[in-house]
Amino acid sequence: MRHYIAIIVLFFQAHFISAQSVGKWSFSSQQLPVYEYTGRLPNIVLDKLGKDSYIQTDPYFLLGNYRLSLFVHASGIYQFMTGERAWARVNADENQQNYGSNNAQIIVKKGKNYKKTDLIGLKSIAIDTQRTQKLFGVGFAKYTYRLDEDLSCQRVISVKPSTKINTGNPAFVVSVTLKNSGKVVQELTYSEGMKLNYTPSAIQLYEPTKRPVSYLHKISVDKSTKTTIANLTCTPNLFLNFPSKNQRYIYDVNPPNVFMSTKSFDKDIKSYITVNHDTLSAHLTTILKPGETHTFHIIVGLNYENSKQAIQEQINELLANVNPSNNNEGFYQTAWKKQLPDFTAEKDQIIKREMLWNAYTLEAMATYCAYYGETIIPQGTIYAYHFGDNISNRDHLQAALPVCYTNPNLAKSIIRYVIMHSETDGEIKRGDAGNGCTPPSLYKESDEQLYFFNTLSQYLASTKDYAFLNEKVWLYPAENKKGEVVLNILKNYFVYLRDEIGRGSNGLVKMLNSDWSDSFFHENSPNVYAATAESHLNSVMVLAIFPKLITELKKSKNPEATALIIALENYRKEVSEAYFKDFGNRKFSARAYLNHRKKYGIDNVCIEPQGYLLQIPDLSISRKKEIYQYVKSKIYSPEKIGFRTREKPLWSTTGEGEDGGIWFSLEGSLIAGVATFDKQEAKELLHTISFQNFTDQYPSIWLGQWTGGDNVNSTLSQRDGLCFFWEKDRPNVFQGFCSHPHAWPLYCYLKIKE
């Protein structure tokens, strides 16, 4: 009986105690967003039926630059990740996927006794909300611990921004400040360690003894510089034929070196480095007199040069021009301020805060890919951070849309990266895994070229960089260094769209085996329907995007574009005639015709094509308003945070995921469509998909209050407010920080402001 009572108590605690908000926002001294996490730890989130949410119980934020990704948890745990050669955790926790292994403790001498306090983890002082404050801002995380009435410890993690494409310092600083507010001397030792366990995301799903490769390390300690360096090597556990380090490969055969160093500008602090098996640790011992404050710094990072001198230069660069005693908001607030757009004029404080946060998050997510020599914004979430895949290229192209305004060089790098996945016939590979490896895929996507046209059009419109059309970019595989000028690649993309993807019996653009929806054929075999399936979404994308592309090509005044412009205009006209013949006097677009009998979205509103339908420039405003009001009446109410994908599910009973959920990429395209005829309504919709509105609607669900996945379940589901996650046997591992809930709101905001 006691067992059942305990379960009931936990259930009600999870539902009712957590019904309060888990934190609050403010602004830093540089007027950048800061979030204070005040929720409980562990933060257990359940659905309406009391079932597991799959969300981690230790909420996390993201610090990063183009060469490192650092997920900092509310408990002080961090996941130190790199995506430079392959997505991998440097300090992976073998007991829990998508989690890190690090520790910190402080030992205070009390007479002849010693009192030890653990600072990090779900069994530490961090779970005590009365004794620990947790702040997460732009480029920093700050944990303040009240050890007793007189002694406090502040631990600040700082990440320096990248200011140029393909560059950045892949290291972070942990600054520890100890303060004695009492009247007696305090003698203490502080220690902080990180377990070295380099584990690519793609192989974390294997049991350690069954992994195809292992990463071994040889550790050395340089006492003179107080630095320890771990040289990593990749070793096969079964027969493999390793390539050279610069060739594409599913595994990273050239992992980085990992280092930890300690630095103090305070002569009263004794600091040193130790190694215990696979754990790198930094320590300080000091005596704090009444009223004294002592600070020391730990630098943890990656280095690819296998050089002690290079590591010291990296450390020096990280600490150059910083005030070591002024780290209350991290070391790099001023640098981050310069890197982000200026939204000072925005009077709506929620929108101002969230757009700054979104711009920062995209910069923190952006990742240099060594194989391609380009920097991208990955889709992130479970794709990159859980499975280790940079998929799909259409997602990277969508993430590039807002940075066409905020960081055009980054947008250009993303466009170049996508081109490097292209065959000479105009096919664009879906994405890659490992170090530039493109594994065989069951998907033959029909829309990559359309998303490319959209992003290139926006880039050209924003930058007027028409010379880009004459630049040469490597084609697939990039290591062969065989390239073509962008304009010719653009021509190949169009020919591929027209001839390989083609159009069906109704004159609509075909679907092949997937358009935006990867799941559309889960219930319908592509072997049966791929030859006939037509996509209304692809068709309206042509009608919405081609006019923009044609306009920019004309503005380029490039004589080599003349024939392409004519071909684009003719194709757009043909698709327009076919689409509007099918559309007739309907009040919403159909979704797809798999053949002449199997038609979807005829009497059931599906969101996918509606946003691009509203973006078609020669569709009258009165018709757009009529369409929008009807669509809104069918899939907006009674939703709390946006439009769901379906009026009624097409193939499922739960109405989750692509068959009834709320998807930020679709919300964004719809808002962009509404902005073409009613900017005030578009602003209101922007508030609807905001993190603040999610917090108001779902205060107990932390994932969605400052980041999220690519989707959220709608009210059709018993799990509304939660992300759809198909890995049912992997509880508490869902990794957020998808680019879409950051990129699309920011892009829509910038479009509305035009």
Where are these regions (language model features)?
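Low-complexity, Ser/Thr/Pro/Gly-enriched N-terminal "stalk/linker" regions
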Residues: S21, E36, P324-F387, S413, ...
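C-terminal capping/lid segments that line or modulate ligand- or cofactor-binding pockets
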Residues: G23-P42, Y54-Y78, N358, G388-I391, ...
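Acidic-aromatic substrate-binding/catalytic surfaces of carbohydrate-active enzymes
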Residues: Y60-D128
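Polysaccharide-binding surfaces and accessory modules of carbohydrate-active proteins
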Residues: Q97, Y143, S158-S271, A282, ...
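Beta-strand-rich recognition/accessory modules
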Residues: A171, Y251-N328, Y529-T532, I545
